[in-house]
Amino acid sequence: MLSLAHFLVLGAILFAISIVGIFLNRKNVIVLLMALELLLLAVNMNFVAFSHYMGDLAGQVFVFFILTVAAAESAIGLAILVVLFRNLDTINVDDMDTLKG
């Protein structure tokens, strides 16, 4: 049977991978969004693990709120990406300061 430590280590590994992804790929918007989603999923895994082992459902309910905010954040980020690509024909983060409107 898996213990709490197994889930926390997996969450920490996912969190570290996402932080590395954010720092190494700061030019591409798609990679940044994927790394941010992985970061939120790592936090969600820790919430669910603690909630399960403590016998409280509050952490699992909080995960649904985080997933809802993450979905809205992804939709807004992809909308900005589409506008950036239509106007500038690039998805480079450095070119985002030229958007007006």
Curated annotation (Swiss-Prot):
Gene3D superfamilies for this protein: 1.10.287.3510
Classification via Pfam families: Oxidored_q2
Superkingdom, natural source: Bacteria
Enzyme class: translocase
Subcellular location: Cell inner membrane
Principal location: membrane
Keywords: Cell inner membrane, Cell membrane, Membrane, NAD, Quinone, Translocase, Transmembrane, Transmembrane helix, Transport, Ubiquinone
GO cellular component terms given for this protein: NADH dehydrogenase complex; plasma membrane
Entry-linked PANTHER family: NADH DEHYDROGENASE SUBUNIT 4L-RELATED, NADH-UBIQUINONE OXIDOREDUCTASE SUBUNIT ND4L
Subunit structure: NDH-1 is composed of 14 different subunits. Subunits NuoA, H, J, K, L, M, N constitute the membrane sector of the complex.
Recorded family membership: Belongs to the complex I subunit 4L family.
Protein name: NADH-quinone oxidoreductase subunit K
Record organism: Cupriavidus metallidurans (strain ATCC 43123 / DSM 2839 / NBRC 102507 / CH34)
Lineage: Bacteria, Pseudomonadati, Pseudomonadota, Betaproteobacteria, Burkholderiales
Gene behind this protein: nuoK
